[in-house]
Amino acid sequence: MHRPEWAMLLDLPTITPILTAIFGSSDYIARGGGGDFCLPGATEYQPLHSDSGDRREFNGVTFGSFRDDRNKLTLRDLPCPYVCCNFLMVDFTAINGPTRQIPATQNSPRELPRRSQEPEWMKLSTVCPAPAGSVLIRDVRAWHGGTPNLSQEVRAIPNAEFLAPWYR
Protein backbone atom coordinates (compact mmCIF):
# COMPACT_ATOMS: atom_id res chain seq x y z
CA MET A 1 0.00 0.00 0.00
CA HIS A 2 3.07 2.19 -0.44
CA ARG A 3 2.12 3.34 -3.96
CA PRO A 4 -0.28 6.30 -4.35
CA GLU A 5 -2.72 4.35 -6.52
CA TRP A 6 -3.02 1.71 -3.78
CA ALA A 7 -2.95 4.12 -0.83
CA MET A 8 -5.99 5.96 -2.21
CA LEU A 9 -8.03 2.77 -1.74
CA LEU A 10 -7.61 2.99 2.04
CA ASP A 11 -9.89 5.95 2.71
CA LEU A 12 -12.58 6.27 0.08
CA PRO A 13 -15.64 8.40 0.94
CA THR A 14 -17.91 5.61 -0.30
CA ILE A 15 -16.19 2.77 1.58
CA THR A 16 -15.03 4.34 4.88
CA PRO A 17 -18.56 4.78 6.33
CA ILE A 18 -19.39 1.16 5.49
CA LEU A 19 -16.24 -0.14 7.19
CA THR A 20 -16.96 2.06 10.22
CA ALA A 21 -20.45 0.55 10.44
CA ILE A 22 -19.19 -3.03 10.05
CA PHE A 23 -16.53 -2.63 12.74
CA GLY A 24 -18.52 -0.26 14.98
CA SER A 25 -15.59 2.17 15.00
CA SER A 26 -13.44 4.23 12.67
CA ASP A 27 -10.33 2.88 14.42
CA TYR A 28 -10.07 -0.17 12.17
CA ILE A 29 -6.68 -1.10 10.69
CA ALA A 30 -5.59 -1.27 7.06
CA ARG A 31 -3.95 -4.70 6.84
CA GLY A 32 -2.69 -4.49 3.27
CA GLY A 33 -3.73 -5.17 -0.26
CA GLY A 34 -3.40 -7.59 -3.09
CA GLY A 35 -5.89 -9.18 -5.40
CA ASP A 36 -6.40 -11.95 -7.86
CA PHE A 37 -7.10 -12.52 -11.51
CA CYS A 38 -8.71 -15.07 -13.77
CA LEU A 39 -7.23 -15.69 -17.20
CA PRO A 40 -9.29 -16.37 -20.32
CA GLY A 41 -9.64 -20.09 -20.89
CA ALA A 42 -9.80 -20.99 -17.18
CA THR A 43 -12.41 -23.75 -17.33
CA GLU A 44 -12.42 -25.07 -13.76
CA TYR A 45 -14.20 -23.80 -10.68
CA GLN A 46 -11.84 -22.76 -7.91
CA PRO A 47 -12.67 -24.84 -4.82
CA LEU A 48 -14.72 -23.00 -2.23
CA HIS A 49 -12.55 -21.63 0.53
CA SER A 50 -12.39 -19.15 3.38
CA ASP A 51 -9.56 -16.61 3.58
CA SER A 52 -9.17 -16.87 7.35
CA GLY A 53 -9.51 -19.55 9.96
CA ASP A 54 -8.60 -20.78 13.40
CA ARG A 55 -4.91 -21.16 14.20
CA ARG A 56 -3.66 -24.70 13.68
CA GLU A 57 -0.33 -26.44 13.35
CA PHE A 58 0.44 -28.83 10.54
CA ASN A 59 3.87 -30.43 10.17
CA GLY A 60 5.38 -27.78 12.44
CA VAL A 61 3.92 -24.86 10.46
CA THR A 62 1.27 -22.58 11.97
CA PHE A 63 -1.74 -21.61 9.85
CA GLY A 64 -4.72 -19.40 10.63
CA SER A 65 -5.18 -16.32 12.70
CA PHE A 66 -7.37 -16.95 15.75
CA ARG A 67 -6.78 -19.02 18.83
CA ASP A 68 -8.81 -19.27 22.01
CA ASP A 69 -6.62 -20.85 24.68
CA ARG A 70 -9.78 -21.90 26.54
CA ASN A 71 -11.04 -23.78 23.45
CA LYS A 72 -14.51 -22.26 23.81
CA LEU A 73 -14.62 -19.98 20.76
CA THR A 74 -13.69 -20.26 17.12
CA LEU A 75 -13.11 -17.46 14.64
CA ARG A 76 -16.63 -18.09 13.34
CA ASP A 77 -18.14 -17.25 16.75
CA LEU A 78 -16.78 -13.69 16.67
CA PRO A 79 -18.20 -10.53 15.11
CA CYS A 80 -16.66 -9.74 11.73
CA PRO A 81 -12.89 -9.40 12.39
CA TYR A 82 -11.56 -8.92 8.86
CA VAL A 83 -12.96 -7.47 5.64
CA CYS A 84 -11.69 -7.58 2.09
CA CYS A 85 -12.78 -4.91 -0.39
CA ASN A 86 -12.51 -6.24 -3.95
CA PHE A 87 -12.45 -3.46 -6.56
CA LEU A 88 -14.02 -4.54 -9.84
CA MET A 89 -11.88 -3.30 -12.72
CA VAL A 90 -14.15 -4.81 -15.38
CA ASP A 91 -17.83 -5.67 -15.49
CA PHE A 92 -18.52 -8.99 -13.81
CA THR A 93 -20.54 -11.11 -16.22
CA ALA A 94 -21.70 -14.70 -16.16
CA ILE A 95 -18.83 -15.72 -18.46
CA ASN A 96 -15.72 -13.82 -17.30
CA GLY A 97 -14.99 -15.69 -14.07
CA PRO A 98 -17.05 -13.79 -11.49
CA THR A 99 -16.51 -14.53 -7.82
CA ARG A 100 -19.04 -16.84 -6.27
CA GLN A 101 -20.00 -15.95 -2.72
CA ILE A 102 -21.97 -18.37 -0.57
CA PRO A 103 -24.39 -16.41 1.64
CA ALA A 104 -24.45 -16.79 5.43
CA THR A 105 -21.36 -19.02 5.67
CA GLN A 106 -19.14 -16.63 7.65
CA ASN A 107 -20.39 -18.18 10.90
CA SER A 108 -20.95 -21.71 9.61
CA PRO A 109 -19.27 -24.52 11.57
CA ARG A 110 -19.84 -26.93 8.66
CA GLU A 111 -16.94 -28.22 6.61
CA LEU A 112 -16.50 -26.86 3.12
CA PRO A 113 -17.87 -29.20 0.47
CA ARG A 114 -15.46 -30.66 -2.06
CA ARG A 115 -15.99 -29.53 -5.63
CA SER A 116 -17.52 -32.88 -6.53
CA GLN A 117 -19.99 -32.60 -3.62
CA GLU A 118 -20.92 -28.98 -4.15
CA PRO A 119 -24.62 -28.38 -4.82
CA GLU A 120 -25.42 -26.68 -8.12
CA TRP A 121 -26.81 -23.59 -6.38
CA MET A 122 -23.37 -22.91 -4.86
CA LYS A 123 -21.72 -23.02 -8.29
CA LEU A 124 -24.33 -20.53 -9.52
CA SER A 125 -24.08 -18.17 -6.51
CA THR A 126 -22.04 -15.60 -8.42
CA VAL A 127 -21.66 -11.88 -7.84
CA CYS A 128 -22.92 -10.82 -11.26
CA PRO A 129 -23.87 -8.83 -13.08
CA ALA A 130 -21.82 -6.13 -11.39
CA PRO A 131 -20.38 -3.11 -13.21
CA ALA A 132 -16.75 -2.04 -13.26
CA GLY A 133 -16.18 0.44 -10.45
CA SER A 134 -18.23 -1.59 -7.97
CA VAL A 135 -16.72 -2.81 -4.73
CA LEU A 136 -17.40 -6.26 -3.32
CA ILE A 137 -17.08 -5.94 0.46
CA ARG A 138 -16.82 -9.35 2.07
CA ASP A 139 -16.20 -10.98 5.41
CA VAL A 140 -13.17 -13.15 4.63
CA ARG A 141 -14.57 -16.04 6.70
CA ALA A 142 -17.40 -16.55 4.19
CA TRP A 143 -17.03 -19.31 1.62
CA HIS A 144 -16.18 -18.11 -1.86
CA GLY A 145 -14.33 -19.16 -4.98
CA GLY A 146 -13.65 -18.38 -8.60
CA THR A 147 -15.60 -19.54 -11.63
CA PRO A 148 -14.54 -20.37 -15.20
CA ASN A 149 -13.52 -17.46 -17.41
CA LEU A 150 -15.04 -18.25 -20.79
CA SER A 151 -14.45 -14.73 -22.12
CA GLN A 152 -11.44 -13.43 -24.04
CA GLU A 153 -10.43 -10.92 -21.34
CA VAL A 154 -8.43 -11.12 -18.12
CA ARG A 155 -10.62 -10.49 -15.09
CA ALA A 156 -8.52 -8.75 -12.41
CA ILE A 157 -9.64 -7.74 -8.91
CA PRO A 158 -7.27 -5.67 -6.76
CA ASN A 159 -8.22 -5.47 -3.10
CA ALA A 160 -7.64 -3.67 0.18
CA GLU A 161 -7.99 -5.53 3.48
CA PHE A 162 -9.06 -4.19 6.86
CA LEU A 163 -9.05 -5.55 10.43
CA ALA A 164 -11.44 -4.71 13.25
CA PRO A 165 -9.85 -2.49 15.93
CA TRP A 166 -9.98 -5.36 18.45
CA TYR A 167 -8.48 -7.97 16.11
CA ARG A 168 -4.70 -8.36 16.08
Q: How should each PLM-predicted stretch be described?
A:
Residues 140-141:
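Short, surface-exposed secondary-structure boundary micro-motifs
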Residues 1-132, 145-153, 162-168:
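Non-heme Fe(II) oxygenase catalytic core, chiefly the N-lobe of the double-stranded beta-helix
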